[in-house]
Amino acid sequence: MKLILNLITAGSLLVALAPAQPRYTVADLGAFPGGNSSAGYGINNAGWVTGCSNLTPGGPLQSFIWYGIGPLIEIPTLGGPGGCADGPNAFGEAAIISATSKPPYMNEAFCGLTGASGDQNQCLAAVWKNGRLTALPTLPGGHNSQTYWLNNLGQVVGFSENGISDPTCATGTPYQVLRFEGVIWGPDGEVRELRPLEGDTTGFAWGINDHGQAVGSSGLCSNTSVSGPVGPTAPHAVLWDRDGSPTDLGHLEGVPAGVYNVATSINDRGDVVGFAQASDGTQHGFLWTKETGMQDIGGFPGAGNGTGAPCCNTINNTGEIVGFSIDANFNFRALVWQDKMPIDLNTLIPADSPLYLTGSESLNDSGQITGTAIVKSSCPVTTPPAWQTNQSLCTETHAFVATPCFP
Protein backbone atom coordinates (compact mmCIF):
# COMPACT_ATOMS: atom_id res chain seq x y z
CA MET A 1 0.00 0.00 0.00
CA LYS A 2 1.22 3.31 -0.74
CA LEU A 3 1.05 4.63 2.72
CA ILE A 4 0.23 7.19 3.91
CA LEU A 5 -1.04 9.94 1.60
CA ASN A 6 2.24 9.99 -0.31
CA LEU A 7 0.73 12.16 -3.10
CA ILE A 8 3.01 13.98 -5.40
CA THR A 9 3.57 16.71 -8.09
CA ALA A 10 6.25 18.44 -10.09
CA GLY A 11 6.44 21.42 -12.41
CA SER A 12 8.21 21.02 -15.70
CA LEU A 13 7.93 19.23 -19.01
CA LEU A 14 4.37 18.49 -20.08
CA VAL A 15 3.65 16.50 -23.20
CA ALA A 16 1.59 17.79 -26.12
CA LEU A 17 -1.72 16.02 -26.54
CA ALA A 18 -2.07 13.52 -29.36
CA PRO A 19 -5.34 13.62 -31.32
CA ALA A 20 -6.47 10.17 -30.10
CA GLN A 21 -5.55 10.77 -26.50
CA PRO A 22 -8.43 10.34 -24.06
CA ARG A 23 -9.69 13.09 -21.84
CA TYR A 24 -11.33 12.39 -18.49
CA THR A 25 -14.41 13.20 -16.47
CA VAL A 26 -13.78 13.41 -12.73
CA ALA A 27 -15.94 12.24 -9.82
CA ASP A 28 -15.23 13.65 -6.35
CA LEU A 29 -15.66 10.84 -3.79
CA GLY A 30 -15.54 13.22 -0.83
CA ALA A 31 -14.46 12.16 2.64
CA PHE A 32 -16.12 10.64 5.69
CA PRO A 33 -18.57 13.00 7.43
CA GLY A 34 -16.52 15.30 9.63
CA GLY A 35 -13.29 14.51 7.79
CA ASN A 36 -11.28 16.72 5.46
CA SER A 37 -8.87 14.26 3.83
CA SER A 38 -9.29 11.08 1.79
CA ALA A 39 -7.32 9.12 -0.81
CA GLY A 40 -8.23 6.43 -3.33
CA TYR A 41 -5.56 3.72 -3.52
CA GLY A 42 -7.14 0.95 -5.60
CA ILE A 43 -9.83 0.51 -8.26
CA ASN A 44 -11.14 -2.73 -9.79
CA ASN A 45 -12.69 -3.32 -13.20
CA ALA A 46 -16.17 -2.67 -11.78
CA GLY A 47 -15.06 0.82 -10.73
CA TRP A 48 -15.09 0.04 -7.00
CA VAL A 49 -12.51 2.01 -5.02
CA THR A 50 -10.65 1.38 -1.77
CA GLY A 51 -8.63 3.85 0.25
CA CYS A 52 -8.77 5.78 3.49
CA SER A 53 -10.21 8.96 4.96
CA ASN A 54 -10.04 10.72 8.28
CA LEU A 55 -13.11 11.23 10.46
CA THR A 56 -11.96 14.56 11.89
CA PRO A 57 -9.45 17.10 10.53
CA GLY A 58 -5.98 15.91 11.43
CA GLY A 59 -7.36 12.67 12.87
CA PRO A 60 -6.24 9.11 12.07
CA LEU A 61 -7.09 7.52 8.75
CA GLN A 62 -9.86 4.94 8.40
CA SER A 63 -10.27 2.37 5.59
CA PHE A 64 -13.13 2.69 3.11
CA ILE A 65 -14.63 0.93 0.13
CA TRP A 66 -16.78 2.73 -2.45
CA TYR A 67 -19.09 0.70 -4.68
CA GLY A 68 -19.36 3.12 -7.60
CA ILE A 69 -22.34 5.03 -6.18
CA GLY A 70 -23.30 6.46 -2.83
CA PRO A 71 -21.08 7.35 0.10
CA LEU A 72 -17.77 5.90 1.24
CA ILE A 73 -18.37 2.75 3.31
CA GLU A 74 -16.25 2.56 6.45
CA ILE A 75 -14.23 -0.62 7.06
CA PRO A 76 -13.54 -1.27 10.76
CA THR A 77 -10.10 -1.59 12.33
CA LEU A 78 -8.53 -4.34 14.42
CA GLY A 79 -9.23 -2.29 17.53
CA GLY A 80 -6.83 0.59 17.04
CA PRO A 81 -7.17 4.18 15.83
CA GLY A 82 -6.46 3.88 12.12
CA GLY A 83 -6.40 1.89 8.90
CA CYS A 84 -6.12 2.08 5.13
CA ALA A 85 -7.29 -0.17 2.28
CA ASP A 86 -5.86 -1.28 -1.07
CA GLY A 87 -7.29 -3.36 -3.89
CA PRO A 88 -10.09 -4.22 -4.33
CA ASN A 89 -9.99 -7.39 -6.40
CA ALA A 90 -12.78 -8.58 -8.69
CA PHE A 91 -14.67 -10.03 -5.71
CA GLY A 92 -14.56 -6.86 -3.62
CA GLU A 93 -11.89 -8.22 -1.27
CA ALA A 94 -9.45 -5.61 0.01
CA ALA A 95 -5.94 -5.61 1.48
CA ILE A 96 -5.96 -3.68 4.76
CA ILE A 97 -3.38 -2.23 7.09
CA SER A 98 -4.92 -1.64 10.51
CA ALA A 99 -3.83 -0.41 13.90
CA THR A 100 -4.57 -2.62 16.89
CA SER A 101 -5.12 -1.66 20.52
CA LYS A 102 -1.65 -2.91 21.50
CA PRO A 103 1.14 -0.40 22.22
CA PRO A 104 4.13 -0.21 19.87
CA TYR A 105 6.99 -2.67 20.29
CA MET A 106 10.12 -0.88 21.57
CA ASN A 107 8.55 2.44 20.51
CA GLU A 108 8.64 1.46 16.82
CA ALA A 109 6.73 3.59 14.29
CA PHE A 110 6.08 0.97 11.65
CA CYS A 111 2.78 2.10 10.18
CA GLY A 112 2.37 5.85 10.02
CA LEU A 113 -1.36 5.70 10.72
CA THR A 114 -1.88 7.67 13.89
CA GLY A 115 0.65 10.44 14.29
CA ALA A 116 4.29 11.27 14.83
CA SER A 117 7.10 8.72 14.98
CA GLY A 118 7.15 6.93 18.32
CA ASP A 119 3.42 7.57 18.83
CA GLN A 120 2.08 4.46 17.13
CA ASN A 121 0.09 1.37 18.01
CA GLN A 122 0.96 -2.05 16.70
CA CYS A 123 -0.30 -2.47 13.13
CA LEU A 124 -1.16 -5.65 11.26
CA ALA A 125 -1.95 -6.75 7.74
CA ALA A 126 -5.55 -7.84 7.31
CA VAL A 127 -8.01 -8.80 4.58
CA TRP A 128 -11.57 -7.53 4.11
CA LYS A 129 -13.69 -10.38 2.75
CA ASN A 130 -17.43 -11.06 2.84
CA GLY A 131 -17.98 -8.11 5.17
CA ARG A 132 -15.42 -9.27 7.75
CA LEU A 133 -11.96 -7.99 8.63
CA THR A 134 -9.48 -10.78 9.42
CA ALA A 135 -5.95 -10.21 10.72
CA LEU A 136 -3.16 -12.00 8.85
CA PRO A 137 -0.24 -13.68 10.65
CA THR A 138 3.20 -12.10 10.92
CA LEU A 139 6.42 -13.99 10.32
CA PRO A 140 7.61 -15.78 13.49
CA GLY A 141 8.74 -13.25 16.10
CA GLY A 142 7.32 -10.26 14.25
CA HIS A 143 5.09 -7.66 15.91
CA ASN A 144 4.02 -5.57 12.89
CA SER A 145 3.07 -6.11 9.26
CA GLN A 146 1.66 -4.15 6.33
CA THR A 147 -0.27 -5.00 3.17
CA TYR A 148 0.08 -3.37 -0.23
CA TRP A 149 -1.94 -5.27 -2.83
CA LEU A 150 -3.96 -8.40 -3.56
CA ASN A 151 -4.85 -10.35 -6.69
CA ASN A 152 -7.98 -12.07 -7.93
CA LEU A 153 -6.81 -15.36 -6.39
CA GLY A 154 -7.02 -13.83 -2.93
CA GLN A 155 -3.24 -13.62 -2.47
CA VAL A 156 -2.10 -10.55 -0.52
CA VAL A 157 1.40 -9.03 -0.57
CA GLY A 158 3.20 -6.74 1.82
CA PHE A 159 5.88 -7.14 4.46
CA SER A 160 6.26 -8.37 8.02
CA GLU A 161 8.78 -8.10 10.80
CA ASN A 162 10.65 -11.36 11.34
CA GLY A 163 11.77 -11.10 14.95
CA ILE A 164 15.47 -10.47 14.23
CA SER A 165 16.82 -7.44 16.09
CA ASP A 166 19.24 -5.36 14.03
CA PRO A 167 20.98 -2.31 15.54
CA THR A 168 21.56 -0.87 12.05
CA CYS A 169 17.80 -0.49 11.46
CA ALA A 170 17.62 2.78 13.36
CA THR A 171 20.13 4.30 10.92
CA GLY A 172 18.08 3.77 7.78
CA THR A 173 14.63 3.40 9.34
CA PRO A 174 14.07 5.64 12.37
CA TYR A 175 12.16 4.02 15.23
CA GLN A 176 12.58 0.54 13.70
CA VAL A 177 14.14 -2.27 15.77
CA LEU A 178 13.37 -5.52 13.91
CA ARG A 179 14.18 -6.59 10.38
CA PHE A 180 11.30 -7.06 7.96
CA GLU A 181 10.79 -9.09 4.78
CA GLY A 182 8.37 -9.24 1.88
CA VAL A 183 5.58 -11.79 2.27
CA ILE A 184 2.63 -13.34 0.46
CA TRP A 185 -0.47 -14.29 2.42
CA GLY A 186 -3.09 -16.70 1.16
CA PRO A 187 -5.21 -17.47 -0.54
CA ASP A 188 -6.19 -19.15 2.75
CA GLY A 189 -4.43 -16.74 5.12
CA GLU A 190 -1.12 -18.58 5.46
CA VAL A 191 2.06 -16.46 5.35
CA ARG A 192 4.99 -17.20 3.04
CA GLU A 193 8.33 -15.42 3.20
CA LEU A 194 9.72 -13.69 0.10
CA ARG A 195 13.44 -13.81 0.73
CA PRO A 196 15.51 -10.74 -0.16
CA LEU A 197 18.28 -10.90 -2.71
CA GLU A 198 21.50 -12.61 -1.67
CA GLY A 199 23.45 -10.28 0.60
CA ASP A 200 20.35 -8.31 1.63
CA THR A 201 18.55 -8.66 4.98
CA THR A 202 15.26 -6.78 4.57
CA GLY A 203 12.61 -6.25 1.94
CA PHE A 204 9.01 -5.52 1.07
CA ALA A 205 6.53 -6.61 -1.61
CA TRP A 206 4.37 -3.93 -3.23
CA GLY A 207 2.49 -5.60 -6.10
CA ILE A 208 1.26 -9.01 -7.30
CA ASN A 209 -0.38 -10.25 -10.51
CA ASP A 210 -2.86 -13.06 -11.12
CA HIS A 211 -0.01 -15.49 -11.86
CA GLY A 212 1.33 -15.07 -8.32
CA GLN A 213 4.41 -13.07 -9.37
CA ALA A 214 5.24 -10.34 -6.85
CA VAL A 215 7.42 -7.22 -7.02
CA GLY A 216 9.04 -4.93 -4.48
CA SER A 217 12.53 -4.21 -3.19
CA SER A 218 15.22 -5.47 -0.85
CA GLY A 219 18.27 -4.07 0.91
CA LEU A 220 19.91 -3.82 4.31
CA CYS A 221 18.04 -2.52 7.33
CA SER A 222 20.46 0.42 7.34
CA ASN A 223 19.45 1.55 3.83
CA THR A 224 15.81 0.42 3.65
CA SER A 225 12.96 2.58 4.90
CA VAL A 226 9.45 1.41 5.76
CA SER A 227 7.98 4.85 5.02
CA GLY A 228 8.82 8.17 3.41
CA PRO A 229 7.50 10.79 0.97
CA VAL A 230 7.09 8.14 -1.75
CA GLY A 231 6.56 5.08 0.46
CA PRO A 232 9.12 2.42 1.41
CA THR A 233 12.43 2.47 -0.45
CA ALA A 234 15.39 0.08 -0.81
CA PRO A 235 18.39 -0.26 -3.16
CA HIS A 236 17.29 -3.28 -5.23
CA ALA A 237 14.09 -3.65 -7.26
CA VAL A 238 13.00 -7.30 -7.10
CA LEU A 239 10.65 -9.65 -8.93
CA TRP A 240 9.69 -12.81 -7.06
CA ASP A 241 8.46 -15.67 -9.25
CA ARG A 242 5.62 -17.98 -8.23
CA ASP A 243 8.05 -20.23 -6.36
CA GLY A 244 9.42 -17.26 -4.39
CA SER A 245 12.76 -17.08 -6.19
CA PRO A 246 13.95 -13.45 -6.44
CA THR A 247 15.31 -11.67 -9.54
CA ASP A 248 17.22 -8.38 -9.36
CA LEU A 249 15.62 -6.00 -11.89
CA GLY A 250 18.80 -3.92 -12.12
CA HIS A 251 19.04 -0.14 -12.26
CA LEU A 252 18.84 2.69 -14.77
CA GLU A 253 21.65 2.87 -17.30
CA GLY A 254 24.71 4.72 -16.03
CA VAL A 255 23.54 4.78 -12.41
CA PRO A 256 25.82 3.03 -9.88
CA ALA A 257 24.41 0.40 -7.56
CA GLY A 258 23.36 1.52 -4.09
CA VAL A 259 20.70 4.15 -4.81
CA TYR A 260 17.05 3.18 -4.41
CA ASN A 261 15.13 1.13 -6.96
CA VAL A 262 11.53 0.28 -6.09
CA ALA A 263 9.19 -1.96 -8.11
CA THR A 264 5.57 -1.06 -7.35
CA SER A 265 3.30 -2.95 -9.77
CA ILE A 266 3.29 -5.95 -12.13
CA ASN A 267 0.61 -6.78 -14.69
CA ASP A 268 -0.43 -10.19 -15.97
CA ARG A 269 2.04 -9.91 -18.88
CA GLY A 270 4.90 -9.61 -16.38
CA ASP A 271 5.60 -5.94 -17.13
CA VAL A 272 6.82 -4.04 -14.06
CA VAL A 273 6.79 -0.34 -13.16
CA GLY A 274 8.33 1.58 -10.31
CA PHE A 275 10.71 4.41 -9.53
CA ALA A 276 14.47 4.70 -9.30
CA GLN A 277 17.07 7.30 -8.48
CA ALA A 278 19.06 8.58 -11.45
CA SER A 279 22.73 9.59 -11.57
CA ASP A 280 21.87 13.29 -11.08
CA GLY A 281 19.99 12.48 -7.87
CA THR A 282 16.51 12.94 -9.33
CA GLN A 283 13.84 10.28 -9.21
CA HIS A 284 12.60 8.71 -12.46
CA GLY A 285 9.78 6.35 -13.28
CA PHE A 286 10.77 3.07 -14.90
CA LEU A 287 9.25 0.29 -16.96
CA TRP A 288 10.86 -3.16 -16.82
CA THR A 289 10.11 -5.97 -19.26
CA LYS A 290 11.83 -9.31 -19.70
CA GLU A 291 12.85 -8.25 -23.21
CA THR A 292 14.18 -4.75 -22.51
CA GLY A 293 15.17 -4.67 -18.86
CA MET A 294 14.72 -1.42 -16.90
CA GLN A 295 13.85 1.59 -19.09
CA ASP A 296 13.67 5.22 -17.98
CA ILE A 297 10.18 6.49 -18.83
CA GLY A 298 10.60 10.11 -17.98
CA GLY A 299 11.78 12.58 -15.42
CA PHE A 300 10.93 16.20 -14.74
CA PRO A 301 14.26 18.11 -14.88
CA GLY A 302 14.86 21.26 -12.88
CA ALA A 303 14.24 20.14 -9.30
CA GLY A 304 17.75 19.10 -8.48
CA ASN A 305 17.13 18.13 -4.86
CA GLY A 306 16.38 14.53 -5.78
CA THR A 307 12.62 14.81 -5.30
CA GLY A 308 11.57 16.42 -8.55
CA ALA A 309 10.63 13.45 -10.69
CA PRO A 310 7.84 10.98 -11.28
CA CYS A 311 6.90 7.86 -9.42
CA CYS A 312 5.05 5.12 -11.28
CA ASN A 313 2.42 3.48 -9.10
CA THR A 314 0.45 1.04 -11.23
CA ILE A 315 0.46 -0.62 -14.66
CA ASN A 316 -2.73 -2.27 -15.92
CA ASN A 317 -3.12 -5.24 -18.25
CA THR A 318 -3.28 -2.98 -21.33
CA GLY A 319 0.06 -1.34 -20.44
CA GLU A 320 -1.29 2.01 -19.21
CA ILE A 321 0.69 3.54 -16.33
CA VAL A 322 -0.23 6.09 -13.66
CA GLY A 323 1.66 7.78 -10.86
CA PHE A 324 2.63 11.16 -9.51
CA SER A 325 5.53 13.60 -9.25
CA ILE A 326 6.87 16.00 -6.67
CA ASP A 327 8.69 19.28 -7.14
CA ALA A 328 11.43 20.93 -5.09
CA ASN A 329 8.82 22.58 -2.84
CA PHE A 330 6.87 19.37 -2.24
CA ASN A 331 3.94 20.20 -4.47
CA PHE A 332 2.25 17.19 -6.01
CA ARG A 333 0.81 16.41 -9.45
CA ALA A 334 -1.08 13.38 -10.79
CA LEU A 335 0.42 11.76 -13.88
CA VAL A 336 -0.63 9.37 -16.62
CA TRP A 337 1.89 7.98 -19.10
CA GLN A 338 1.32 8.11 -22.85
CA ASP A 339 3.97 6.64 -25.17
CA LYS A 340 6.28 6.24 -22.14
CA MET A 341 6.13 9.97 -21.36
CA PRO A 342 4.48 11.46 -18.25
CA ILE A 343 1.56 13.83 -18.75
CA ASP A 344 -0.05 16.03 -16.11
CA LEU A 345 -3.51 14.50 -15.65
CA ASN A 346 -4.87 17.96 -14.83
CA THR A 347 -4.38 18.95 -18.49
CA LEU A 348 -6.79 16.17 -19.51
CA ILE A 349 -9.76 17.11 -17.29
CA PRO A 350 -12.20 20.05 -17.54
CA ALA A 351 -10.45 23.33 -16.80
CA ASP A 352 -13.22 24.37 -14.39
CA SER A 353 -12.89 21.23 -12.26
CA PRO A 354 -13.21 21.99 -8.52
CA LEU A 355 -10.38 19.50 -7.94
CA TYR A 356 -6.63 19.66 -8.62
CA LEU A 357 -5.39 16.10 -9.02
CA THR A 358 -2.25 15.48 -6.96
CA GLY A 359 -1.71 11.73 -7.14
CA SER A 360 -2.79 8.93 -9.49
CA GLU A 361 -2.55 5.83 -7.32
CA SER A 362 -4.19 3.07 -9.38
CA LEU A 363 -6.10 2.34 -12.57
CA ASN A 364 -8.22 -0.51 -13.90
CA ASP A 365 -8.16 -2.20 -17.30
CA SER A 366 -10.72 0.30 -18.65
CA GLY A 367 -8.36 3.17 -17.84
CA GLN A 368 -10.32 4.55 -14.88
CA ILE A 369 -7.93 6.21 -12.41
CA THR A 370 -8.24 6.77 -8.69
CA GLY A 371 -6.07 8.86 -6.42
CA THR A 372 -6.11 12.06 -4.40
CA ALA A 373 -6.96 15.66 -5.27
CA ILE A 374 -6.91 19.04 -3.57
CA VAL A 375 -10.28 20.74 -3.21
CA LYS A 376 -9.49 24.10 -4.79
CA SER A 377 -11.99 26.00 -2.62
CA SER A 378 -9.99 24.96 0.48
CA CYS A 379 -6.98 26.99 -0.72
CA PRO A 380 -6.40 30.72 -0.20
CA VAL A 381 -6.67 32.93 -3.27
CA THR A 382 -3.15 33.46 -4.60
CA THR A 383 -1.39 34.08 -7.90
CA PRO A 384 -0.29 31.59 -9.11
CA PRO A 385 -2.87 29.27 -7.52
CA ALA A 386 -1.86 27.75 -4.19
CA TRP A 387 -3.10 24.32 -5.29
CA GLN A 388 -0.25 24.29 -7.82
CA THR A 389 2.59 26.12 -6.08
CA ASN A 390 1.95 26.14 -2.31
CA GLN A 391 -0.23 23.16 -1.55
CA SER A 392 0.53 23.21 2.18
CA LEU A 393 -1.87 26.19 2.42
CA CYS A 394 -4.81 24.06 1.25
CA THR A 395 -6.91 22.31 3.89
CA GLU A 396 -8.96 19.66 2.11
CA THR A 397 -8.11 16.67 -0.11
CA HIS A 398 -10.52 14.12 -1.60
CA ALA A 399 -10.36 10.77 -3.32
CA PHE A 400 -11.37 10.89 -6.98
CA VAL A 401 -12.19 8.69 -9.95
CA ALA A 402 -11.19 9.90 -13.43
CA THR A 403 -13.00 8.10 -16.26
CA PRO A 404 -11.59 8.32 -19.81
CA CYS A 405 -13.68 9.59 -22.69
CA PHE A 406 -12.57 10.05 -26.28
CA PRO A 407 -13.30 13.08 -28.48
What would you call each of these model-derived segments?
Residues 3-5, 11, 17-407:
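Residue-level hotspots at or immediately adjacent to binding/recognition sites across diverse folds
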